């Protein structure tokens, strides 16, 4: 079994549009993490929170859209950092990008886009933000763009978003 839920643990519809925390339950789902205190891994009714954000369509096909820790929560809505990164990286002058949520007094968080350009390329912040027009919801468009020489990576090549969140926590 699988379901998606919002921040208040309300189950969301299988419409392919709503996205929330992915939870799974069944005989093949783990009961506890190794060395975890017994009974602390699953929710009371047996659901396991995967740490993923997903959508499920009417046919039951599930698509993971982000990790729970990376999704940006803005004004009660969730913005996929992965969708914003993929859109930015589709720009012909962008080598790599990362999107993190930064504090916003009205919306709780807003997306901040960090961009590493391809060698020898130049582009303005405005051109990057215009690139999003028609590709994502207008309210998803990052509030700002920061150009960086490089982005930090783990040994396996993943962008270290924790490090970026620390570096830009007071942005």
Please report, for each region that a protein language model flagged, where it lies by residue.
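Hydrophobic alpha-helical segments, especially N-terminal targeting/anchoring helices
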Residues: 5-6, 16, 50, 56, ...
């Amino acid at each position: 079994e699988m379901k998606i839920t919002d921040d208040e643990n309300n189950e969301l519809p299988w419409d392919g549009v709503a996205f929330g925390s992915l939870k799974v339950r069944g005989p093949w789902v783990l009961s506890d993490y190794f060395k975890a205190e017994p009974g602390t891994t699953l929710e009371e009714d047996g659901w396991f929170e995967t740490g993923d954000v997903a959508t499920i369509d009417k046919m039951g096909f599930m698509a993971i859209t982000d990790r729970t820790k990376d999704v940006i929560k803005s004004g009660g809505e969730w913005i996929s950092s992965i969708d914003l990164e993929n859109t930015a990286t589709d720009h012909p002058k962008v080598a790599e990008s990362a999107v993190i949520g930064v504090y916003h007094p009205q919306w709780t968080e807003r997306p901040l886009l960090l961009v590493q350009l391809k060698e020898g390329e130049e582009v303005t912040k405005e051109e990057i933000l215009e690139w999003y027009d028609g590709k994502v919801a207008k309210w998803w468009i990052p509030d700002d763009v920061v150009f960086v020489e490089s982005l930090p990576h783990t040994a396996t090549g993943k962008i270290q978003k924790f490090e970026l969140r620390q570096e830009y926590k007071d942005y």
